Structures are given as structure tokens and as C-alpha cells.
Amino acid sequence: MKYCKPKSKSILSLDVGLKRIGLAYCDSLFITVNILPALKRERNNNEIIIIKEHIKKHNLTGFIVGLPLDEAGGMTSQALDCKTYGEFLFNELKLPFSFVNEHSSTWESTNRFGVKKDKSGLIDSLSAKIILEQWIQEGPELKELVGNKQI
């Protein structure tokens, strides 16, 4: 499936894990992709406060959430958790969003950036950066409705 380059906008990328959420964002012209400190994932979702602060500070207009699909493109248990979290974020943020297949993004960030055995969350934010770079190259365009997810 071929996608056209997404329209100009500043995007937040999230690599959602069970313990941490890696964050990265890009400028509206897709020239730079920067990482942000990873967030500890809270049971009561208090991390949403910091996510909202990043959105305001960097004037972000949409977000993407990585889905760790299996090699055949099927949903994994972690992908289901990421999907649920992405829908939660949409309801909280009311911003256009999309899901992106992030199969092997952690492996790629470990190899590409040489970060191993990281407990700080750096690898999570580097994975969010890779997910965002992939989205910039491949799409899909952001959607405003949860029911219109694209992978």
C-alpha cells in the first residue's frame, strides 16, 4: 500500500510500553525529529498531564501511536494495549491521530543508536523517534475519529 506524504503539521509520537512511554516530536515541516524524556506509565494515567504540557509547549497538532504488530501484521497483546491507550489519548486530547505499525522499532533503535540495557527510557524515546520518521516517510494521514484507525 502506498501513501502520500502527510500534510504539514507538528506531531507527537508515542512508543507505549507497559512501564514507560517514549516520546518524540517533529516540527511542522518534518525537518527535525526530537526526542523527549520518556514518561513512567502510571496506573491512574497521570502522565497525560505531562503529555498535554508537551503538546502546548511544542504547539503539536496531532499524534501517532506505535502498534507492535507481529511479523504477519496481526495484533499482539501489547498492540491491543497500545490501541486502547491511543484511543484513551484521543478522547483526552481531541487531536487527530493515527496508529503506525512499529514492528521491531526497539530492535532498530538498539542497533541504530547503540543503546543497550537502558532503564532510563532513552531507548523508548528513540523508538518513538523511529516510529515518527517511519510515519513521515510512509503515512498514513492522521484521522480525527477513533473508528478510522489505519495501519
Swiss-Prot record:
It is found in: Cytoplasm. One of its GO terms (biological process) is rRNA 5'-end processing. It comes from the Bacteria. GO terms for cellular component: cytosol. Its EC number is 3.1.-.-. SMART domains: YqgFc. InterPro entries: RNaseH-like_sf (IPR012337), YqgF (IPR005227), YqgF/RNaseH-like_dom (IPR006641), YqgF/RNaseH-like_dom_sf (IPR037027). Keywords: Cytoplasm, Hydrolase, Nuclease, Ribosome biogenesis. Its main location: cytoplasm. One of its GO terms (molecular function) is nuclease activity. Could be a nuclease involved in processing of the 5'-end of pre-16S rRNA. NCBIfam families: RNAse_H_YqgF. PANTHER family: POLYNUCLEOTIDYL TRANSFERASE, RIBONUCLEASE H-LIKE SUPERFAMILY PROTEIN. Belongs to the YqgF nuclease family. This is Putative pre-16S rRNA nuclease.
